[in-house]
């Protein structure tokens, strides 16, 4: 199994953002049960991550969004597209980003 934080670092994400830990936890949860957690991201995924860290689901979402915005403004798709192996033209939403990273880890952990 791939280490989620290793993949986040490989993608160029900075651990200085609180959203980094929330994102790592969110991706790990999605790897356990993608259908459940991605069905209703706010009330399923962000709620559980928020409970782990003692914050609200809105705080989790905002922190992950801030991390993605900063990442995208600095890197655009220069790192993400080559890492994933397909072009990413537009900034992904938080749930899309989580899904992309989880898919990448699933694809590469089975090799």
Spans of features found by a protein language model:
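Short alpha-helical "recognition helix" segments of helix-turn-helix
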Residues: 48-50
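Helical mechanochemical/support elements of P-loop NTPase systems and associated helical scaffolds
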Residues: 19, 60-63
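C-terminal engagement/docking regions of AAA+ P-loop ATPases
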Residues: 53, 62-65, 72-111
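Histone-fold modules and their flanking histone-like tails across chromatin and transcription assemblies
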Residues: 1-44, 92-111
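AAA+ P-loop ATPase catalytic core
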Residues: 26-30, 64, 71
């Amino acid at each position: 199994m791939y280490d989620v934080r290793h993949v986040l670092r490989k993608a160029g994400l900075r651990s200085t953002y609180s959203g980094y830990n929330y994102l790592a936890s969110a991706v790990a949860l999605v790897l356990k049960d993608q259908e459940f957690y991605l069905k209703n991201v706010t009330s399923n995924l962000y709620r559980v991550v928020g409970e782990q860290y003692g914050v609200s689901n809105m705080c989790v979402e905002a922190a992950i969004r801030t991390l993605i915005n900063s990442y995208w403004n600095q890197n655009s798709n220069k790192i993400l597209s080559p890492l994933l192996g397909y072009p990413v033209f537009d900034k992904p939403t938080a749930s899309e980003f989580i899904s992309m990273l989880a898919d990448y880890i699933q694809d590469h952990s089975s090799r």
